[in-house]
Curated annotation (Swiss-Prot):
Glycyl lysine isopeptide (Lys-Gly) (interchain with G-Cter in SUMO2) crosslink, residue number(s): 189
Provenance organism: Homo sapiens
Record GO terms (molecular function): mRNA binding; RNA binding
RRM domain ranges (all copies): 16-94
Name the record gives this protein: Cleavage stimulation factor subunit 2
Omega-N-methylarginine: residues carrying this PTM: 308, 468, 475
Region entry Interaction with RPO2TC1, spans: 514-577
Assigned keywords, A-Z: Disease variant, Intellectual disability, Isopeptide bond, Methylation, mRNA processing, Nucleus, Phosphoprotein, Repeat, RNA-binding, Ubl conjugation
Gene: CSTF2
UniProt region (Interactions with CSTF3 and SYMPK), positions on chain: 108-248
PANTHER family xrefs: CLEAVAGE STIMULATION FACTOR SUBUNIT 2
Length: 577
């Protein structure tokens, strides 16, 4: 025996060790080591754990420095009570403990197979999966680290090892899935791709290798293993599943942009949605006018077309795609409520004469309306409903006196561009028809009342009082020294009381320009010099006057006070109650 000990360290180690059974499950190796150190120094104490559950099996092995100490432990500690149980201490090399030595892998000659007990091929995948899942994360990481080094240093040997031990390859793949190194879908493809490899393998791994990469075993493994790897096969679908999903979404999304613009840009009212503006930018098929609109915005207020849809002859409706507000920044052009928008030279036929804004000496009643709209305006009256309160021109010049505010400050505060435009898109969009009637009647009546103080055009129909075009001939004295039709030049020289006059003249300008387009004598030379800023001022004042009480309440205190003062002064000047 001594010779065997010298020749075989494994046998010597088994002789120096004792088998300890009937160990309480809650016992720790340290506690047992303290007990067995009573008979002599303990080299190590190892508890045996179940590979499937990770729980202790209730027995272990204690190694001493020599065989005599081990024999002493068997004599003195056998039957020792610990936590209510009598420990069983026996020779570790006895025949009845061979299986325990096998499971420990101590290297004793009694171990016949390095693969453990033989299992059926059908159970191999589940057994391997459980064994891998029972490994602590640190040990699993260390295993993968060592395998990586092995593959890097000796790729051919590692390949041969994995081919000869398919259960090891399967376990490594399972570990990679558990550690989320490999997607479950990819793992399945790898397994199925290796179905023909087991034919190259022969020898003792036969019982287990069929369970490794074999196709039947693969299926059973994935069916039987309800653990994280299998669960990840659902959550990990994004690795291989995402491209089809993305393709599907792209396929579904390709027609969508083409269909949406057609639905949105078709009718004028529907084009109110801001999304229409984005679609117009994309330039989808079926909305030819939209792409044109983005490049050159016609001079028609989209709200007029939106409200009644009766202006196809003189207005391209797609302008409404970009929002209800004439000053909608998405429209790319300032379309003030007065309709006087700076023509960039791309909006009117050149033969119709230069725009009113750019040629001060031009007779401003006849041609400018045609020029601003790209064609004659047979029916300008529907535009009367344009100057709605929530659509203040946010880029107009200062209000000149009522608090010294600049409407651009209003724009900066988001008074009109956001709060009012939002209200215009929602509440005003719903009352488009009601607003039309109200603007055509109430505002027209107010316009006539206020215009009566400036002109003798009481007989002019309210329908002709559009906010576009130059002012009609001065048929009556205009108070406060304002120029007849160009009181829009009110700037800073017009008193607040008379400031309403330019507004009303602005409302009557279109009617006069259309109805009296052949009355050049009604204007003085200086009255032709109407600038876009003048019209913007008039439009801004008209918009301010049309703000509802709710809209005014939403404004900052300064702006609210200024608007209230303006309204009060206008009411006083017009004698309104």
């Amino acid at each position: 025996m001594a010779g065997l000990t010298v020749r075989d360290p494994a046998v010597d180690r088994s002789l120096r060790s004792v088998f300890v059974g009937n160990i309480p499950y809650e016992a720790t190796e340290e506690q047992l080591k303290d007990i067995f150190s009573e008979v002599g120094p303990v080299v190590s104490f190892r508890l045996v754990y179940d590979r499937e559950t990770g729980k202790p099996k209730g027995y272990g092995f204690c190694e001493y420095q020599d065989q005599e100490t081990a024999l002493s432990a068997m004599r003195n500690l056998n039957g020792r009570e610990f936590s209510g149980r009598a420990l069983r201490v026996d020779n570790a090399a006895s025949e009845k403990n061979k299986e325990e030595l096998k499971s420990l892998g101590t290297g004793a000659p009694v171990i016949e197979s390095p693969y453990g007990e033989t299992i059926s091929p059908e159970d191999a995948p589940e057994s391997i999966s459980k064994a891998v899942a029972s490994l602590p994360p640190e040990q699993m990481f260390e295993l993968m680290k060592q395998m990586k080094l092995c593959v890097q240093n000796s790729p051919q040997e590692a390949r041969n090892m994995l081919l000869q031990n398919p259960q090891l390859a399967y376990a490594l793949l399972q570990a990679q899935v558990v550690m989320r190194i490999v997607d479950p879908e990819i793992a399945l493809k790898i397994l199925h791709r290796q179905t023909n490899i087991p034919t190259l393998i022969a020898g003792n791994p036969q019982p287990v290798h069929g369970a490794g990469p074999g196709s039947g075993s693969n299926v059973s493994m994935n069916q039987q293993n309800p653990q994280a790897p299998q669960a990840q096969s659902l959550g990990g679908m994004h690795v291989n599943g995402a491209p089809p999903l993305m393709q599907a979404s792209m396929q579904g999304g390709v027609p969508a942009p083409g269909q949406m613009p057609a639905a949105v840009t078709g009718p004028g009212p529907g084009s109110l949605a801001p999304g229409g503006g984005m679609q117009a930018q994309v330039g989808m098929p079926g909305s030819g006018p939209v792409s044109m609109e983005r490049g050159q915005v016609p001079m028609q207020d989209p709200r007029a077309a939106m409200q009644r849809g009766s202006l196809p002859a003189n207005v391209p409706t797609p302008r409404g795609l970009l929002g209800d507000a004439p000053n909608d920044p998405r429209g790319g052009t300032l379309l003030s409520v007065t309709g006087e928008v700076e023509p960039r030279g791309y909006l009117g036929p050149p033969h119709q004469g230069p725009p009113m804004h750019h040629v001060p000496g031009h007779e401003s009643r006849g041609p400018p309306p045609h020029e601003l709209r790209g064609g004659p305006l047979p029916e300008p009256r529907p535009l009367m409903a344009e100057p709605r309160g929530p659509m203040l021109d946010q880029r107009g010049p200062p209000l000149d006196g009522r608090g010294g505010r600049d409407p651009r400050g209003i724009d900066a505060r988001g008074m009109e561009a956001r709060a009012m435009e939002a209200r215009g898109l929602d509440a005003r969009g719903l009352e488009a028809r009601a607003m039309e009637a109200r603007a055509m009647e109430a505002r027209a009546m107010e316009a006539r009342a206020m215009e009566a103080r400036a002109m003798e055009v009481r007989g002019m129909e309210a329908r002709g009082m559009d906010t576009r075009g130059p002012v009609p001939g001065p048929r009556g004295p205009i108070p406060s020294g304002m120029q007849g039709p160009s009181p829009i030049n009110m700037g800073a020289v017009v008193p607040q009381g008379s400031r309403q006059v330019p507004v009303m003249q602005g409302t009557g300008m279109q009617g006069a320009s259309i109805q009296g387009g052949s009355q050049p004598g009604g204007f003085s030379p200086g009255q032709n010099q109407v600038t876009p800023q003048d019209h913007e001022k008039a439009a801004l004042i008209m918009q301010v006057l049309q703000l509802t009480a709710d809209q005014i309440a939403m404004l900052p205190p300064e702006q609210r006070q200024s608007i209230l003062i303006l309204k009060e002064q206008i009411q006083k000047s017009t004698g309104a109650p």
